[in-house]
């Protein structure tokens, strides 16, 4: 097993180093997946949209039947304190979390009064600006009738993970996932954009994928810079015929796609503008 990178977690009033055991085999979180989290980044001295990330984890908790017991200002203060435990030049992943310790009114439901929480920060380098090779996944996104898609919930990620693993087995880095209607939703690990004839397109949020904070920021920054951004229903064929494809998400922020199936792509001007605008925003 690979060693963990440098990690600090605030739990129950203390900062704990490493990967502390916070749940046991009877914990609802352990065997019933009653967890929500958010992911923010610290890099190059910036923590872009950290306020929106901590607000979202509280909304996710409520959507999952947990109690969002930590105020947003408290989260932000703890993030500031946690950052001091790392070298200033290190890129970090910032992960506020809630989970249920016990079951509730039915055995598989979380007991909101047993809500636990922590804030975990760990070193995670920003990935190099290398393009991704992507393909179409056979796995699809769930709907609000089948999964808690209105929360950033841990239970949603095994479906994304199997899409990623299946794509890797075929020699790709990531995969486009469709919704149940057969339209493009997102990549297995991030939101997705395409450009065609000078216009940027991205799937319109429809309740079947997370409308990411970085996605929203990229859309806004591009529009404010004068770029036309269209949110609409898109097919896989649209992406196969795109001039550019790029992704947005917490791990890499804005990242290019270099290949879709067997068709090679180059990082184009709209991707480069999106990335430049985001980095300027992050450091502004």
Residue ranges and their predicted role:
Residues 1-81, 99, 108-284:
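Helix-start/capping segments and mature chain N-termini
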